[in-house]
Structure formats: C-alpha cells, structure tokens
Amino acid sequence: MSFRKTHPLIKIVNSTLVDLPSPANLSVNWNYGSLLGLVLVIQLITGIVLATRFSGHSDMSFDSVISIYQDSNYGWLLRLVHSTGASFFFLFIYLHIGRGLYYGSYVYPEVWNIGVLIYLILMGTAFLGYVLPWGQMSYWAATVITNLLSAIPWLGPTMVEWVWGGFAVGNPTLTRFFALHYLLPFVVTALVILHIFYLHIYGSSNPLGISSNTNKVSFHYYYSVKDLYVYFVFFFVFMVFTLKYGYVFMDAENFIPANPLVTPTHIQPEWYFLFAYAILRSIPNKLGGVVGLLLAVLVLFLFSVSTSKLLFSGTIYSPLARLLYWSLVSNFFLLTWLGSCPAESPYNEVALVATVTYFTFMLTMCALPHISTYLYLKS
C-alpha cells in the first residue's frame, strides 16, 4: 500500500484531504469552509508574531501598536493582514452559515452545533482583539459591552467588577483580554478539527439536498485543484484590500488614544457585529436588549432540533422557504446598516421592526421543514 495510507499520521491527512469521498456536484458555495481554514491559519500566524511585539498594558498598548508599524520589519503589513483578515473571516463565516441555511446543512446536528459554537467563540475573540489597540473606540466598546453583564439580576454588578478587575475598564481588563485573545483561537482550532471530524462521519450536504452515497468522487484532484483556484482569487482580493484599502474596516476614533473622560459621539463595534448591536439597541429595556442580543445568535441552535425526522430541509424545493431566506438576508443587511446609524429616531423605531422581523423569519424558517414533513405524512 501507499505510504500515505499506512503511516499513522499521514493517513489521517490522507483521509481528510486526499482520498475523502465527496459528492460529485459540490458548487463554489462549498468553498467557504476551506477558505475559513486558510484564514484561520493566517490569523494564527500573524497573531502570534504580533504578540511578540505587543504590550498588554494600558500605558503602553497604543504606543506598542505604533511601534509595530514604525520599528518592526514589515510590522505594518502583519498588523494590516491581521485586521483585514478578521473582516474576511467573518465575511466567509456569514456566507458559510448562509449556505448551510439555504441547503439544509443543519440536518447533521453535531456538525451544525459545533459550527455555531465556533461562531460564538469567534465573536468573543474578535471583540477581545478590538479592545487591544486601546484607542477611543476600543476603550468605550469594552466599557459598553462588559457593562451588559450588569443586566443579570443579583450577580450582574459583581460580575462587571470581576471582569474589569476594578471599578472601571483599565489595565487589569486589558491584560486579561490580551491573554484570552491569545488563547481562544487555539480553542477554535480544536473545535474546527472536531467540526471536520463529524463532517467526515456524516458526509457533506450537496446542492440537490439528496443522498450522494451513490455518486462520490475523491477529494483530490477534483476539489483540491478547485480549492487552490479559489485560494488564488482570495489572495488577490485580500492583498488588494490589505495594501490599498487597509484602513477601510477600521474606525477613525481608534486612532486616538483611549481617554476615559471623553466619550466618542457614536460608539459602534466592527461591521460584522452591527446587526447584533442594532438588535441590542432597538429594545428599550436593558435586560431585554441583552437577551435579544444572545438570541440573535443562539436561535441558530434551534435549526438542528429533531432533524432526524425531517423529510424536507433547506430551501431547495420550497418557494416559500426561499422567499423567507432572502427576506432574512435582506433583513440582516438592514440591521447591519441600522447598527451603524445614530441611536435616535427614526432609526430606533425601524431597528425595532427589523428585530421583530428577524426573529419571525428565523423561527418560521426553523419550523417550516417540520410543518412540511407533517403535512406530507398526513396526506
């Protein structure tokens, strides 16, 4: 037998990337997973290198970022690659989740739930990284988001002080945020390996939404070459954004050192959190806003409930499901835009309506496969 099939370590890679049986009809929509793996590697490498020159101290953090730009060889490039990579990471995550919803990938509960868990941890990791440069937006975003814990009855105020390490966001907060931002990507990497492990046990979905057990092809060369082509396209677009538009995803306020005495006119997170931020702001009650913020993501877990009994999944053969799906996508874009708008009328009222429709579309899409299966069996 071939060496790659007998060596105890190489054969694991072989079964994952070479001889993996794959559906013969996978489209470009199935490339986002491999792109996410590539971006994760880029983020890990650039993050570890940047950590060697970064100082997680409130007095030196902002200056250390400037030092990385000015005093380190290609430090400016590493920092821009890392910050731009975060935006591309979440872009591919949303496309990956969107493809999963459209084609019914939630019928594999273990794969789906681990994926949603990865998304949750990545949201936390990205938020921690947003705080590290210790600019104005970093400081006040940390203050606003950590203050949400105070909405928890009884324990809230104590938990806020515990997270802060004092009575306000300061050096202890930054130090522990830096430590967590460094460690969490390795947790994500472990979950990604588990995600791929379960994916290879249950198999992949496909554009037709039917079993592909009778029509499989080897992953290499067919899909490995296809992935390489997409990698080249990604690298071209990624480097254009990094080198020509490197600051387009950054907030101008974050180029000002953190000042606890001056509040920015408009506090907002990065673009990939704006939809959740709009939901948080749209609900007048503080606890209600926090619950809405959590449910905006946790609602994805509902899709994997009782999927073993489903005869229909995804939107492929249902015009109503497709209408709901694209309405949800439009609603997501609307919430993202509203999250970047000032917290005033009429944006608050529109955001509240968009929040209600977001959960309506989500819950209806979640229930529709079960309703369709019930009506089919009843008839």
From Swiss-Prot:
Positions bound to heme b b562: H82, H181
Top-level lineage group: Eukaryota
Keyword annotations of the record: Electron transport, Heme, Iron, Membrane, Metal-binding, Mitochondrion, Mitochondrion inner membrane, Respiratory chain, Transmembrane, Transmembrane helix, Transport, Ubiquinone
GO cellular component terms, semicolon-separated: mitochondrial inner membrane; respiratory chain complex III
Membrane topology: Multi-pass membrane protein
Positions of a ubiquinone binding: H200
Record's subcellular location: Mitochondrion inner membrane
Gene3D superfamilies named in the record: Cytochrome Bc1 Complex, Chain C (1.20.810.10)
InterPro entries: Cyt_b/b6_C, Cyt_b/b6_C_sf, Cyt_b/b6_N, Cytb/b6-like_sf, Cytochrome_b, Cytochrome_b_N_euk/bac, Di-haem_cyt_TM
Pfam families named in the record: Cytochrom_B_C (PF00032), Cytochrome_B (PF00033)
The keyword Iron appears for this protein: yes
Annotated coiled-coil segments of the chain: none
Cofactor detail note: Binds 2 heme b groups non-covalently.
Gene Ontology BP terms: mitochondrial electron transport, ubiquinol to cytochrome c
Named cofactor requirement(s): heme b
Binding site for heme b b566: H96, H195
Annotated transmembrane regions: 32-52, 76-98, 111-131, 177-197, 223-243, 287-304, 320-340, 348-367
Keyword Iron tagged: yes
A molecular-function term among this protein's GO annotations: metal ion binding
Reported function: Component of the ubiquinol-cytochrome c reductase complex (complex III or cytochrome b-c1 complex) that is part of the mitochondrial respiratory chain. The b-c1 complex mediates electron transfer from ubiquinol to cytochrome c. Contributes to the generation of a proton gradient across the mitochondrial membrane that is then used for ATP synthesis.
Quaternary data: The main subunits of complex b-c1 are: cytochrome b, cytochrome c1 and the Rieske protein.
Family indicated by similarity: Belongs to the cytochrome b family.
Protein name as catalogued: Cytochrome b
Originating species: Brachionus plicatilis (Marine rotifer)
Taxonomic lineage of the native organism: Eukaryota, Metazoa, Spiralia, Gnathifera, Rotifera
